[in-house]
Design a protein with these regions (language model features):
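Short, well-ordered alpha-helical segments in soluble proteins
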Residues: 57-64, 76-77, 102, 106-116, ...
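Extended, charge-rich, solvent-exposed interface segments
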Residues: 13-85, 159
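OB-fold and OB-like beta-barrel modules that bind single-stranded nucleic acids
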Residues: 1-12
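Residue-level signal for short amphipathic helical patches enriched in basic/charged
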Residues: 60, 93, 119
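A general alpha-helix detector
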Residues: 52-53, 108, 163
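A short mid-domain helix/strand-loop element embedded in enzyme catalytic domains
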Residues: 65-108, 130-134
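A ubiquitous short alpha-helical element
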Residues: 35-41, 92-94, 148-152
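Divalent metal-dependent catalytic cores for phosphoryl transfer on phosphate-bearing substrates
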Residues: 90, 100, 111-207
């Protein structure tokens, strides 16, 4: 990474109002120096989004499913989840982006299924909260938001499935039906195979 100082101003020779960047100084940043303030960061209130997330988890009525969420969103992974970007460049590509995107998806999903009969509301919440959990393993929150080894070798969908599989083994009485339903949501959340999902949506909760 480098530090740059300069200014942006209108190009007086441009006919269409283009801007030009005038660089006064550029230098390498010393190794180990804190550069977190240089990273793009969400404009939303992180603390408010954390409260929204916790409230969503609290709405899950099935104890094993709620316990699974607690198992996954804890410790170091929780810290990575609230800090990580949701993508390298396509959407929510900034610090706090993954938390923001996840909460927004969950709230939208709940608004859609509010009046729908014969749907597992708990599974909708859990699936929405976990659909991109693999991005805590796929993308680094350091400068450049580069892909990790897991990101290059597996991608976030596979990483997410592995995280859920591992957590489900730690939760007593976690049903096989819920395990399959939750994993299906993660596998199918891109919608189509052409968009990266190994399978297409086959349950109401996944849709």
């Amino acid at each position: 990474p480098v530090v740059v100082s300069g200014q942006v101003q209108a190009d007086r020779y441009s006919q269409d109002g283009k801007l030009q960047l005038l660089v006064d100084f550029i230098d390498l940043i010393a190794a180990g120096k804190d550069v977190s303030q240089l990273l793009a960061t969400t404009t939303k209130d992180i603390q408010e989004y954390k409260k929204k997330f916790i409230n969503l988890v609290a709405q899950v009525k099935k104890p094993p499913l709620r316990e699974l969420l607690g198992e996954i969103f804890s410790g170091e992974r929780w810290e990575k989840f609230i800090r990580n970007p949701a993508a390298k460049r396509f959407h929510h590509a900034y610090i706090g982006g993954l938390l923001e995107h996840t909460v927004d998806v969950a709230e939208t999903a709940l608004a859609i299924v509010g009046a729908m009969p014969n749907i597992d509301r708990d599974m909708v919440i859990a699936g929405a909260l976990l659909h991109d959990i693999g991005k805590t393993e796929e993308i680094s929150a350091a400068i450049g938001f580069s892909y990790t080894d897991s990101g290059h070798l597996m991608g976030h969908i596979t990483a997410g499935v592995l995280l859920v599989e591992d957590a489900a083994r730690q939760v007593q009485y976690f049903s096989e039906a819920d395990r399959k339903s939750l994993i299906h949501i993660i596998l199918s959340h891109h919608g189509d195979r052409e968009k990266g999902s190994p399978v297409c949506c086959a349950t109401r909760e996944a849709v």
